[in-house]
């Protein structure tokens, strides 16, 4: 369970460094951290300086909080996220979302790099998350509930806000960006899925599978933050193509689509 005292300690540290008051948060997935470099007047705070923050060891993830502005909006960006497969607790994985809420964030964009399960999709596509499937039997809200942070029994019928999704769709159409829509399945990792597991995941109704996003989205929902999720489909999931999977492929594909990704996210933020 997240402790209010810990959240406030982290908040006080950030506010002692910058007077920028962010209303929009973004969590940047593997290979997508370059968006943070587009923020104007940015302040960079290493995770190691923030109390109660973990540090990601995943390739493609820096470890700093970047606070600045874009499109006339103040933004706090996580340049690097924490993954459950790294051995962090779900409290550690999701603590940054609690900090964002304390800093004043009202809307959150969660991004990730993941594998395409839907065979109509292709590597390099962007996918707007419409819903998710939690395959892990874990939930960041397990344990005592602090009513100051959110309700005990959370309605998750609309984790990914419809109004915000409509904005993203409108931006993609205006910019002639191909934007898929689909269901994201959370897989703990760090192993990729087996071909049999991918067949199961497809049967369950997922269009993409990855190792993040769902814990943060659930805590954002619990905190009352309107959330939207955007996936960069960096590879076809295991067994679809006759080739092995690698994290290098994930980073390489994310690099190729970063300009399109930045354009979509920047314009979306300006319309929030």
Where are the regions that the model predicts?
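Non-catalytic positions within long, well-ordered alpha-helices that form the structural scaffold/packing
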Residues: 101-104, 202, 221
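Active-site/ligand-binding-proximal alpha/beta "capping" segment
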Residues: 171-207, 265
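Short acidic/polar active-site loop segments enriched in Thr and Asp
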Residues: 106, 207, 226
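His/Asp/Glu-rich mid-to-C-terminal helical/loop segments that flank catalytic regions of hydrolases
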Residues: 238-272
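Metal-dependent peptidase/peptidase-like ectodomains
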Residues: 145-187
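Metabolite-binding pocket within alpha/beta catalytic cores that recognizes anionic/polar moieties
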Residues: 1-156
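Generic non-transmembrane alpha-helical segments
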Residues: 13, 17, 163, 167-178, ...
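Zn-dependent metallopeptidase/amidohydrolase metal-coordination segment
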Residues: 211-249
